[in-house]
């Protein structure tokens, strides 16, 4: 996308006319039109005003970041030598406006991986926790100690008493670590939906148009002296609208990837371009996969639209291979160290 095209895109995204921008910049309509038509480059002073108007850095305005770049800091598998792997997920996301940490994995493994990948976590300006399980939020304290300023968006129910049940052992606590009170002033608690800005929206509790909770049957919430199935009201998803593309990011999609995708479609008017996250079709501690019937139904339900799916973590190898026969090249594996850059010219992968 040329700079002139980028200017037009930004203006149209805000629902503004050319004369509105000219007035805001204190220049004539003709002068502004020359910028959008590619007849003249703005002077630095005008660029600074444009950047301030759109709340962008100069780099983002002039196109040094005209894409959404997603790097898997941590996943169950490591795609590069020297990186840690652990059961969990942590993604680093760069947009024209933001540097985002989405989930922190089970511990501090994501820190060494970030260093090895050249990711500066001190520059992260906001973090998102997808849900209240320790394989996604176990590294929360580690992040807060490395980065002392980024707000952390998490659902108001994220600190619930969440457990995994087993036939032959006691219920195991899998909620967020205790002792995070010292960082409470960093937390921004969300509910069903929160619009952070024009790029980022968080949403939870997608309507159940598809029954996909069977794969989460052993996951529970403690209520009094007993347990009840976890309804995953504490799970939220990140919808990104940036660089002319739409990206949907989920942690485990416990509420069902089809339901989450359908909710995103209702907000966008179309399916997102790219999805990142687990499908939760692999159940610990026993390690059984979801039924072939459920996997196939999900695969067929994901066919409409042109969304490219990057998945891993709790999807499981068996389910991934089976889904691959249905979705083909639209299904791609996540692994630690991989990067996908989503821009106007498509997706560029680095592994």
Predicted regions and their residues:
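Cap/insert and terminal regions of metallo-dependent hydrolase folds
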Residues: 134-136, 151, 229-237, 241-336
């Amino acid at each position: 996308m040329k700079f002139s095209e980028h200017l037009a895109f930004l203006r149209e995204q805000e629902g503004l006319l050319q004369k509105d921008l000219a007035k805001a910049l204190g220049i004539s309509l003709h002068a502004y039109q020359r910028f959008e038509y590619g007849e003249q480059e703005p002077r630095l002073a005008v660029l600074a005003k444009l950047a301030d108007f759109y709340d962008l850095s100069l780099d983002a305005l002039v196109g040094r970041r005209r894409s959404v770049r997603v790097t898997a800091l941590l996943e169950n598998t490591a795609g590069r030598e020297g990186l840690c792997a652990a059961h969990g997920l942590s993604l680093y996301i760069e947009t024209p406006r933001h540097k985002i940490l989405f989930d922190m994995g089970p511990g501090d493994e994501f820190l060494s991986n970030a260093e090895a990948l050249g990711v500066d976590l001190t520059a992260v300006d906001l973090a998102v926790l997808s849900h209240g399980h320790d394989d996604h939020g176990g590294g929360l304290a580690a992040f807060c100690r490395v980065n002392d300023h980024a707000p952390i968006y998490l659902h108001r129910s994220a600190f619930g008493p969440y457990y995994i049940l087993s036939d032959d052992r006691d219920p195991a606590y899998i909620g967020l670590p205790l002792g995070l009170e010292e960082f409470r002033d960093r937390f921004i608690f969300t509910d069903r939906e929160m619009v952070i800005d024009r790029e980022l929206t968080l949403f939870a509790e997608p309507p159940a148009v598809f029954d996909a909770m069977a794969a989460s049957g052993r996951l529970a919430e403690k209520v009094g002296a007993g347990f009840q199935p976890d309804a995953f009201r504490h799970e939220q998803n990140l919808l990104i609208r940036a660089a002319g593309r739409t990206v949907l990011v989920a942690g485990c999609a416990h509420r069902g990837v089809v339901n989450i995708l359908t909710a995103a479609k209702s907000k966008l008017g179309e399916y997102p371009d790219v999805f990142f996250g687990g499908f939760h079709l692999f159940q610990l501690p026993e390690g059984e996969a979801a039924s072939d019937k459920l996997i196939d139904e999900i695969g067929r339900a994901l066919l409409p639209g042109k969304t490219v799916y990057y998945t891993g973590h709790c999807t499981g190898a068996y389910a991934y291979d089976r889904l691959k026969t249905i979705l083909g090249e639209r299904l791609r594996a996540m692994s630690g160290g991989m990067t996908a850059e989503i821009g106007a010219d498509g997706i560029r992968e680095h592994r």
